Amino acid sequence: MKVHLLKSKIHNAIVTSGDLEYEGSITIDCELLEKADMIPNEKVLVVNNNNGERFETYIINGVRGSRVIQLNGAAARCALPGDEIIIMTFCEIDAEESREFKPMVLIVDRNNNPKRRHRIGEEDEQLD
């Protein structure tokens, strides 16, 4: 049997901009993607901590070091610049493997600088 689990998340990211004219997606600084164990084109669930909105989209690589978290297309209507969001990816694995699987959590500051990360159930790794 397969189960769906949290694979990784970027916690408390701040939306930096939006582009309604773009076809869709969320643009994320590629350095943040690497630290959070996420990849371009991966499906994400985004939760807006300011208004409770939840939506799905996919990732586009942003410029390294830019700290960009930009919502594109219709997603730009779901959060405004300055809103705090959580960006999550999920995976499907065998139920047996799920007992050992530990999602990656990247925590960022108000400027989207990576502060620390950890696999759930393990010690934090300080990044600043």
UniProtKB/Swiss-Prot annotation:
Its EC number is 4.1.1.11. Binds 1 pyruvoyl group covalently per subunit. This is Aspartate 1-decarboxylase. GO terms for cellular component: cytosol. CDD domains: Asp_decarbox (cd06919). Catalyzes the pyruvoyl-dependent decarboxylation of aspartate to produce beta-alanine. It comes from the Bacteria. Heterooctamer of four alpha and four beta subunits. The keyword Lyase applies. It is an enzyme of class 4 (lyase). The active site is at S25 (schiff-base intermediate with substrate), Y58 (proton donor). HAMAP family: PanD.
